[in-house]
Amino acid sequence: MSFLDSVLKAFVGDKSKKDVKEIQPIVNKIKALESEFEALSLDELRAKTSEFKAKIAEATKEVEDKIVALNKEADEIDDITRKEDIYAEVDALKEKSYEISEAVLNDILPEAFATVKETAKRFVNNTQLKVKASSFDREISAEKDYVTLEDDHAIWSNSWDAAGKPVTWDMVHYDVQLIGGVAMHQGKIAEMQTGEGKTLVATLPMYLNALTGNGVHLVTVNDYLAKRDSAWMAPIFQFHGMSVDCVDYHRPNSAARRKAYNADITYGTNNEFGFDYLRDNMSHAPDDLVQRPHNYAIVDEVDSVLVDDARTPLIISGPVPKGDTHEFMELKPAIANIVEVQRKHLVKVLSEAKKLIKEGDTKEGGFQLLRVYRGLPKNKALIKFLSEEGIKQLLQKTENHYMQDNNREMPKVDAELYFTIEEKSNQIDLTDKGIEFLSGKDEPDFFVMPEIGMEIAKIEKEGFPAEEEAEKKEELFRDYSVKSERIHTLRQLLKSYTLFEKDTEYVVIDNKVKIVDEQTGRIMEGRRYSDGLHQAIEAKENVKIEDATQTFATVTLQNYFRMYGKLSGMTGTAVTEAGELWEIYKLDVVEIPTNRPIARNDKEDLVYKTKREKYNAVIDHVTDLSNAGRPVLIGTTSVEISELLSRMLKLRNVPHNVLNAKRHKQEADIVAEAGNSGIVTIATNMAGRGTDIKLSKEVKEAGGLAIVGTERHDSRRVDRQLRGRAGRQGDPGSSQFYVSLEDNLMRLFGSERIAKLMDRMGLEEGEVIQHSMISKSIERAQKKVEENNFGVRKRLLEYDDVMNAQREVIYKRRYHALFGERLRVDLANMIFDISESITETNKAAEDFKNFEFELIRNFSMSSPVSEEEFKKMNAQKLAGEVYKSAYKHYDEKMSHNAERAFPVIKQVHEDERNNFERISVPFTDGTKTLSVVTNLEKAYETEGKQLIKDFEKNITLAIIDDAWKTHLRKMDELKQSVQLAVHEQKDPLLIYKFEAFELFKVMLENVNRDVMSFLFKGEIPSTGAPSIHEARQTKSKEKVETRKEEIPNMDERAAQSRAAGNTQRQQPEVTETIVRDRPKIGRNDKVTVKNVMSGESKTMKFKQAIPLLDKGDWVLVEE
C-alpha cells in the first residue's frame, strides 16, 4: 500500500470496512430468521417461493393491468397520434413496474436468502428429501435421475452429475457469502478471494431476482464453467420449481436455445450471450428471436470479461464481393527478403556497437545501439546485451537525445534501416531505403502513392475531350486504390514477420492460425485479427488464406452488458481495476472479507539479470519443492516458455503436466491432478483455471500448494489470480515470482531507476536480488501498462458509443417492424419526415414545379395545394397539409390493396384441396418484385388486412437491413480515414462523431424514402390467382460467421495514419467502397429505360440515359 493510500485511510476510513458495515444489518436479519426456517417442513420451505412470487404479482398488479388495457386500446384504434401517446405511456409504466418489483425484492431479501441457505443445509444433512410432488417435479423427474417419483411424492437425492463429474452437495452459505450475495443483488461487484465459493454465493441473488419471472443470466468466461456450474447448482433452484438451463448446450437460433433463455435462470458464456443478441437483430420473424429483454446479469470473473475482453468487439460477418483477391502471397517473398537483409545488417551493427562501447566511445556506440533497437527490438542478442551494466541506461539516454524536438534527429538513426519498429505501440514503418529496395529498378513507382490533387490538375490542364478526361481520372483513382491496398498489405506482412511470434501470440493447429489469449493462455476459437493482419500471418505460415469478410452486425461486450436493467459481478481480483469499472459501468467494487484468514506466504520477487539464469533458478526451486512432497503450479506467459520449462524438467526427471493453448482439451484432467503430492503443473495464465485444485491432508502438512511465477504479467490482476490458486479457504501455501531484466515488462516499461539500482548494486551474472524496492518498481511498471490499456479501452468505448446510439435507433425500428404493433406509428413518422423535407427544400427555393414532382416521386400523389396556396402558406403549415394528404392517400392505397387481394385469398382458402398454412403473395413497385409471406387463416379472417401488415413488415425489414450493412462498412472506413486528422492538429474522435452523425442522418433519410416509395408504389401484379402459392418453410440463410476481432488500438491507427501522412498531406476524406449492384455498362452501350409514371419505354445510348436516370422518374430495364 502506498504512503498516500495509508494517509487517506487514516482520515477517510477504509472503504471495504464501510461497505461491509452497511450490509451487516441485512445479514443479521437473515441470521435471525434461521431458527424459524429450520422449524419449517420441506413442503412449507418450498411454499415460500410461491408466497414471494404472489407478493411481487400483487404489488405490480395495478400497473400490469393498465399496460394490458392500453395495449388493447392501441390495437383497436386507428388514430396515429393517440397510438403514439399510448405507446409512450406503456413504456413509462413498464419502468414503473420494474421499480415496484425491485422494491419488493429488497423487502423480501432476508427471507429469500434464508430460504436458499436452509435449502442448502437440508441437502447437506439429508441424502434424500421427500416432498409432495408438484407438476414441475413430475416434469423434471423424466429428465434428471436425482428426482424420482413415489406415489404422489417426489424424492430429491443430494448427489448428482455436474458436467461429467459426480458431486454430493456439501456446502452451506457462510456469513461472508451472505454479504457477497447482498452486494451482488444491489448491482455491485463482490471481490472474493479464490476458494471462497463464488459459485455458491451467486445462488442467493439469482434465486431472489428470478422470482420476478423476467430471467437471470449468469455469464462465465468459458463453456466448461458454464456447463459445470449450471449442472452443479441447478437442484437448489429446481427444488423450488425454478427452471435452469445453459445456452452453450444448444445450437444457435434453435428452439432449445429459446427455451434456455425462457428459463428462470440461464447460464452461458459472454460470447454466446452477445452473439445471440446480434443474431436476434438479424432475424426476420418474431419466432426466430431467442432472447428476452435484458433484466439482470451476474458476470463471473467480471474483470476478465468487462476489462480484458473489452477491446474485442463481437462481429457477425458475411462474404464481401471479391473478398478473395489480395496480394499477400505475391508480396511475401519480398518481405521475407527485406526482413532477412535488415537482420544480417543489424547483427553486424550490434557487434560494432559492442566494440565501440567497450573501447569507451559511448557516443557512437550508443548511436549504433539505438539503430539496432529501432530495427530489431526483439533480437535476443540485443536483449542480452541490454541487461549488462549501464547499457540500458545508455540506450535510454541516446534515445531521449534523438527524440527531442519531435524526433528531429531520428532520421539520422533510421538512415541505414529498411524499416523501423515501435514495439510499444505495435507499429512498423518502411523507410525510403526500404521502399527503394522493394520497388526494385524496374518499377520505381511500384509502392509510391500518386498525389491525387496534383495529378487531377495535370489531367485537367491537358484539355482532353470530356470522355477521355473521365477515363484518365478513373484510371488515376484505380491506381491510387491499388497502391494504398498494396502498402497496407505490405505493412501487415512486415508486422507478421517482426512483431508476431508463433507459439507466443498465435499457434498453428490443423493448418489454421489461431490466436492465443494473452490473458488466459487459451486458444480463442473463431477469433481473427482484423485489418488483414490475420491473412498476413496465414501467408507467413503457408496455410490457406481465408477470404475477406464484411461486417453485418457488431457490438462490444461493454455496450452489450450496459443494456441490462441491473448488472453485477464477482471475481477474486477487481480492486486494481475499480476505477475503470466505476467510470465505464458505474459498478462499485465491494471487498468481501475471507471466511478464514489467508495463510499463504507471498514472497518478494527474485530478480535476475538474464532469462537463462532465471529459468535455471526456477527449475532448481521447483525440483526442491517437488522432492519435499508439495504440489507446484508454475505460471508462464506463453506457450513457448511452458514448453521450454517442460524440456528442462524432463532433463531433471521431474514428473509434470503441461497445460497450455495446445492442450486445452485435457484441461480438466490436468487440473484434477494438480493438487497431488509432488506433482508439478506448468500452466499458461490461470484466469478461471485451477478452480478444482483440492489438497490432501499430507499435502497441507507439507506446506500446501506452491505457486511459482516465471514472469510478471502486464497486469497486476493476472498475477493476483495466479497467487490466489494457493491458500484457498485458509489452506497453507506459498507464492514466489521470478523476474529478469530481459522480460518484456522490464524491457518496455521498466524505468531507468531499476537499471541504475541494479548497476549500483553491482549485480554479477548468476546473482539474485530480492528487495521490496525492486518489487515496488515492478508494480509501478505494471501500473503504467494498466493505465495505458485503460486509455485504449476508454478511447475505443468513446468510438463505440457513437455506433451504439445508432445501433439502438436501428434495432428499435427493426423490432417494431418485426412485431408490427408499432410499425404504423413508425411509418406515419416516416411520411411526416419526408413531407417536412420536401416542403422545406422547395419552399426555400419557391419551386412549386419540383415540389409537385417530388410528391409524385415519393408519394405517387399530386399536390394537395395550388401554386398560389403554396406561395402563401408557411413551411410548417404546408408540411402538415402534405402529411395529412399523404397519410390519407397511403391508408386508402393499403385498403385498396387488401380489397384487391382478398378475392384471391378467399378462393385459395375455400378450395378444399389446399391445406396451406402460409401463402406467398408477390408485390411489385414497377421495377422490383418482392414475395410477401402471410398466414392464410389470418389473411382470410381480416379480409386481406393481415397481408398488408406483412407487406409493410417485410419491406421495412429488407430495406433497413440492406442500408445498415452498407452503413456499417462506411463507418469502418470512416474510422480508418479520420485518423489522418492528427496532421491538422484535430481530434479524430470529434471528426468521427460529426461525420458519423451526418452519415447516419443521410442513411435514415434514404431508408425513409426507399420504404415509403416501395409502399406507395407497391401493388399486387394484375395476373391474379396463379401468382399466389404456398410458402415453403425453408429459410434461405446467408453464409455468415461469428468472431471476436482482435483490433489494433487507436494509438496504432493514429501512428499508421501519421506514417501515411509523411508521404502525402491532404484533407482527410471519408473513403467509401463502391459496391456495384448492377453490371458495368459502357457509355456507348444501348439500353432500354422506362418512365415509372407513364410506363413509356425508350432505347438509347447509356450516356444519353444517365440524365434521365439521375432524375429518378426513369428506370433501367434489365434485358
Swiss-Prot record:
Q: What is the annotated localization of this protein?
A: Cell inner membrane; Cytoplasm
The catalysed reaction is: ATP + H2O + cellular proteinSide 1 = ADP + phosphate + cellular proteinSide 2
Comp. bias (Polar residues): 1059-1070
The record lists ATP as bound by 177, 195-199, 692
Among the GO biological process terms of this entry, one is: intracellular protein transmembrane transport
- The enzyme's E.C. designation: 7.4.2.8
Q: How does it sit in the membrane?
A: Peripheral membrane protein
GO (cellular component) term, any one: cell envelope Sec protein transport complex
* The keyword Hydrolase belongs to this UniProt entry's keyword annotation: no
Gene Ontology molecular function terms on file: ATP binding; protein-exporting ATPase activity
Residue ranges of region Disordered?
Answer: 1025-1081
Q: Which UniProt keywords apply?
A: ATP-binding, Cell inner membrane, Cell membrane, Cytoplasm, Membrane, Nucleotide-binding, Protein transport, Translocase, Translocation, Transport
According to the UniProt entry, which residue ranges have a biased composition of type Basic and acidic residues?
A: 1029-1055
- Predominantly, its location class is membrane
Q: How does it assemble?
A: Monomer and homodimer. Part of the essential Sec protein translocation apparatus which comprises SecA, SecYEG and auxiliary proteins SecDF. Other proteins may also be involved.
As for family, the record states: Belongs to the SecA family.
Q: Which PANTHER family match?
A: CHLOROPLAST PROTEIN-TRANSPORTING ATPASE (PTHR30612:SF0), SECA INNER MEMBRANE COMPONENT OF SEC PROTEIN SECRETION SYSTEM (PTHR30612)
Summarizing the function annotation, the protein's role is: Part of the Sec protein translocase complex. Interacts with the SecYEG preprotein conducting channel. Has a central role in coupling the hydrolysis of ATP to the transfer of proteins into and across the cell membrane, serving as an ATP-driven molecular motor driving the stepwise translocation of polypeptide chains across the membrane.
Q: What is this protein called?
A: Protein translocase subunit SecA
